[in-house]
Amino acid sequence: TNSKNSLTVAAVLGVSNYTGPESVSTTSFSNYGPTDDGRIKPDIATKGQAVISTESTGDSDYASKSGTSMAAPGITGVVLLLQEHNYNINSSYLKSASVKGLLAHTADECDTNFFGADGPDYKYGWGLVNAERAATCIMNNGVTSLIYEGTLNEGESYELNLEALEGEELIATISWSDPMGEVYNSSVENMRDYREPVLVNDLDLRVSNSTL
């Protein structure tokens, strides 16, 4: 079902000092979305160019390598550290959907020239991973941030009332694990550019000002 619950990683050039979206540039080999049914992929971006990795020519050899296969392990490492951080604080692990939402929520904006607008796009997903900001979000949960994990049945809604501080950003992110959709027994040719939605659950997030 087009990796709807997985983390798909874009490979970008290394960023030594992030100062804004213009600090991030994609690599020539990193593919981009959308999925056939229009969903955003990839989900997150990290360095995938000239990454020092192990080399099979010897037992202790390393080499500089590039590819999304170098970017994805970087995100895997970030996720493991965040899970360890959450366990050290809360004695529990985050659900997979929470991890995905946390990475999206705390990512840095990437180059906007490709699509001409801020926000998630089909080239970088929700942006450049920011592990420090994600860890801070976990550490400050219930104080300056809130990570809520729950279950919604069909037709249900969840409402949260909070007070935003003047001059401070209010950012909200929703993420969920979607169940398996319909399996199509069709040829590869017929499935190419198949536009039927693969999402089983389509959840919406709404933010409103109760004082207006």
Where are these regions (language model features)?
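Catalytic-core segments of hydrolase enzymes
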Residues: 1-53, 104-107, 171-179
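Extracellular hydrolytic enzyme modules, especially secreted metalloproteases
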Residues: 4-17, 27, 95-101, 105-134
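Short consensus segments that form the blades of beta-propeller domains
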Residues: 18, 90-92, 192-198
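Extracytoplasmic/secreted cell-surface and envelope-processing proteins
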Residues: 18-20, 60, 113, 182
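Hydrolase catalytic cores
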Residues: 45-114
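Solvent-exposed strand-loop boundary residues in beta-sheet-rich modules
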Residues: 57, 209-211
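Secreted peptidase-domain scaffold signal
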Residues: 120-201
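Beta-strand signatures of extracellular beta-sandwich domains
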Residues: 204-208
